[in-house]
Amino acid sequence: MTEFDLSTREGRWKHFGSVDPVKGTKPTTKNEMTDLQSTHKNFLFEIEEVGIKNLTYPVLIDQYQTAGLFSFSTSLNKNEKGINMSRILESVEKHYDNGIELEFNTLHQLLRTLQDKMNQNAAGVDVSGKWFFDRYSPVTHIKAVGHADVTYGLAIENHTVTRKELTIQAKVTTLCPCSKEISEYSAHNQRGIVTVKAYLDKNNDVIDDYKNKILDAMEANASSILYPILKRPDEKRVTERAYENPRFVEDLIRLIAADLVEFDWIEGFDIECRNEESIHQHDAFARLKYRK
């Protein structure tokens, strides 16, 4: 049995089964290697979207840095075998050098870079992340950091924006109107999870505070907003406000829709409200879709 020098890393590797590289015959330099993706002939069909998913990369949302989860795609002509996926990461890295701010204008610039680098007509991106923001308790006005989940969706074809979407998911408090009506005192309440997917005006820039406008529609129409820090005067206010504003999921979803329909920069929306029922083992939910 061969003895290896266990005082060295290489010796220990071989002791545990590593072997020397084979003497290969294939090229080792890029210029000599076959580029299968660049093969040109009739491959029968165009592909609408091909790319990568689940890429985690640092992004900035307002003043906070967070982790963005990206999906990128481009189109592919029928006379091309494949795309060079490494160029997607090269495009991202080029923009990260300048700091990727999660806004539609920066995503548009990133897609234009991707479009040019891949030499394709269409490109798209979806990116999700935690949006952190300052939140003050309602009575004592103590500041803490709140958060919601956001997803940006953008697609372009040539120089035209074909898809422009923003999804926000936030948690609220809902107090049951039926429980309040039938009980001598109190009422059951729970966390509600509200998701709004807004289809934005593709031909114009969004307003400056568009995220806050949508979040306000989601939270203000609930029984109560959630707060990171509550002192006793705050807790009293939150409890009483919830009792004064009971909401079924049906109520909440309609009230949110009534606010969103007034925004001329929103072309349509999907809303889902889901209550994690505190007196049941199941959840309650409602969904609504609206297009102008």
Swiss-Prot record:
Pathway listed: Cofactor biosynthesis; 7,8-dihydroneopterin triphosphate biosynthesis; 7,8-dihydroneopterin triphosphate from GTP: step 1/1
EC number(s) from the headed UniProt entry: 3.5.4.16
Alphabetized GO MF terms: GTP cyclohydrolase I activity
GO BP term, example: tetrahydrofolate biosynthetic process
Record carries keyword Hydrolase: yes
Site (May be catalytically important): C176
Signal peptide: none
Enzyme class at the top of the EC tree: hydrolase
KW Hydrolase (keyword) present: yes
Catalytic function, reaction form: GTP + H2O = 7,8-dihydroneopterin 3'-triphosphate + formate + H(+)
InterPro entries: GTP_cyclohydrolase_FolE2 (IPR022838), GTP_cyclohydrolase_FolE2/MptA (IPR003801)
Keywords attached to this entry: Hydrolase
Family statement: Belongs to the GTP cyclohydrolase IV family.
Classification via NCBIfam families: PRK13674.1-1
Function: Converts GTP to 7,8-dihydroneopterin triphosphate.
The protein's name: GTP cyclohydrolase FolE2
